[in-house]
């Protein structure tokens, strides 16, 4: 999927849904140089790019903005359960004006589950805001949720988020290095 425009979308702009089978059959998919804006206009909990149960995919050089939920979400098994997602690359994306105070428990970039050798690098993420009335949590810039492990998060610029600019719910053996995280609402 290259150089496409997605605008005024009712749900997810791009949904790549693999099966949880070994070996994984959803692999080697590139989403690059796309412009994704104003998604989730009917189903507010929609995502700009949603990638589940996939291997060796590149989500790079995309501009994603003005969604009510997460910009990019990758993974899809809760906790440390066996999982096929690995070696995915989320790099050099420009993600902004996400959440806009509509929902909570989301991020500019969101991951879920064990994902060995997945890389989140060189992204610029800002203006991520959650619904303050929903206990005021979950407007995170980069959000590694339950079990997100064995990943590299490096060289990202993340700022102006209603919660933290980086949040690890629980996980292990992640490498977080050389990022700039600034102006999170909770620290």
Task: Give the residues covered by each predicted segment.
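Right-handed parallel beta-helix
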Residues: 1-11, 25-40, 55-69, 84-99, ...
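Extracellular beta-strand/beta-solenoid scaffold signature
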Residues: 9-22, 42-51, 68-80, 103-112, ...
């Amino acid at each position: 999927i290259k150089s496409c425009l997605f605008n005024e979308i009712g749900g997810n702009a791009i949904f790549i849904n693999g099966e949880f089978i070994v070996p994984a059959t959803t692999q080697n998919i590139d989403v690059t140089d796309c412009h994704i804006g104003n998604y989730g206009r009917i189903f507010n909990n929609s995502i700009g790019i949603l990638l589940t149960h996939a291997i060796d995919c590149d989500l790079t050089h995309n501009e994603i903005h003005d969604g009510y939920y997460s910009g990019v979400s990758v993974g899809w098994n809760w906790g440390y359960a066996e999982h096929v997602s690995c070696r995915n690359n989320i790099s050099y994306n420009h993600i902004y004006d996400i959440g806009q105070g509509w929902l909570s428990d989301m991020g500019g970039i969101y991951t879920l589950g064990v994902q060995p050798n997945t890389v989140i690098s060189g992204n610029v993420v800002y203006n991520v805001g959650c619904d303050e009335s929903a206990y005021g949590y979950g407007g995170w810039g980069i959000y590694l949720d339950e079990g997100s492990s064995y990943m590299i998060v490096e060289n990202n610029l993340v700022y102006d988020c209603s919660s933290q600019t980086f949040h690890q719910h629980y996980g292990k053996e992640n490498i977080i290095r050389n990022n700039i995280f600034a102006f999170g609402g909770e620290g």
